Regions:
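A ligand-binding cleft/hinge motif common to bilobed small-molecule-binding domains
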Residues: 11-20, 69, 90-122
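Short helix-initiation/N-cap motifs at beta->coil->alpha
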Residues: 42-43, 77-88, 124
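Acidic, polar ligand-binding/catalytic clefts
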Residues: 1-49, 115-120
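Ligand-binding clefts/hinges and TM-proximal coupling segments of bilobed small-molecule sensing domains
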Residues: 62-79, 116-117, 146-173
Length: 173
């Protein structure tokens, strides 16, 4: 939007982006979790934000922004990609890998020594975004998204594409 490359898009809703983009209500949530080794002493979310805990995170991701705003003691180690963050974790350079549930499920499927901490630490809200300043378009799109969520279309689409276990539907609409 800022570069005038696109007018409308499916994008994660978050505070920094909301300065230049208007968002609809979310239509899907992508849960963000922490992954640890099964032998880790870190077993619950409350254990994560502690001195000496290192967390690999993809820089500038929506969950990186959330972690930056919400963690006080743990150290974030930023990587340029999920592959790089996964390597930091796999090579024992960090104690935790933060990521979106779909990617972490793939990691756990490939390594029985890894486990995901539940519940999620945050959810990335996927929404439709448009350039600020078009309230009529925003109202139309927001009503459309709310209808697609409430009438079950979004849920049916997730099931049809076999991603319903990786994503969730917002329940507050």
């Amino acid at each position: 939007v800022n570069s005038d490359v696109w007018d409308i898009g499916n994008i994660a809703r978050e505070t920094a982006r909301a300065k230049t983009i208007d968002f609809t209500s979310p239509y899907v949530l992508i849960d963000a979790h922490f992954m640890v080794r099964k032998n880790s002493e870190l077993r619950e979310l409350k254990d994560v934000d502690s001195v000496g805990t290192t967390i690999a995170v993809v820089e500038r991701s929506a969950y990186d922004l959330w972690l930056t705003e919400n963690l006080n003691q743990a150290t974030l180690v930023r990587a340029k990609s999920m592959e790089e963050a996964g390597s930091l974790f796999g090579n024992d350079q960090v104690s935790i890998l933060a990521g979106l549930k779909p990617a972490l499920l793939g990691q756990v499927a490939n390594n029985s020594d890894y486990t995901i901490l539940y519940p999620r630490f945050t959810a990335i809200e996927q929404a439709v975004g448009i350039r600020k300043g078009n309230p009529q378009a925003l109202v139309f799109l927001d009503e459309l998204i709310k209808e697609l969520v409430s009438n079950g279309f979004i849920e049916s689409s997730l099931k049809a594409h076999n991603v319903h276990k990786k994503l969730s539907i917002p329940s507050d609409q």
